[in-house]
Amino acid sequence: SSIEQIDSKFIQRLFNYFGNIELAFNADLNELKNIEGLSVKKAENFLKYRDKVDIDRTYTNVETRGVNFLTLEDENYPKMLKNIENPPAVLYYKGKLFECNLEKTLAVVGSRKASTYARDNLKKIISGLGNTDICVVSGLASGIDTVAHTAAIENNLQTIGVIASGFDYIYPTSNKTLYQNIENGYGAVVS
């Protein structure tokens, strides 16, 4: 996933063909040409950028920052996510992902400018689930996402915050304490 020009659909094709990330990563052009639906240009781009990736340095960087990861071949990769059409090849996370019941989740999606009505009703719904093993899953933007995670924590629920920005910076910065609370015992932040 360190090669920006390569998307998860490409990685999924490699994984499906080779059955192993390491074999896929070390493939040559002739092997890549055998993969149905994979253009020669995409294969050549992969080889060009692959040779610039320092796997050991990337791994050390992830590890020293306290970030964990799962790949598609990991038995702990969430089953529901693995079964979507184009699952992420790698999930990076901080926190206690496996304390969350990934079989019982409540997904919350809503506006960054949520109305008072939406905020209040979401709090009521989540408080009704308090002290159960349901895990709340939402983005970590402002608005309804923040309400969902805050309500989950207030009601002793595990929660998973999904971010698109990676772990280099927190967005919005007003959610810094929320990120830390999730990572430090109330679930996980996933990128």
Residue ranges and their predicted role:
Residues 1-128:
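Short, positively charged patches
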Residues 71-191:
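Glycine-biased, small-residue-rich flexible motifs in mid-sequence functional cores and linkers
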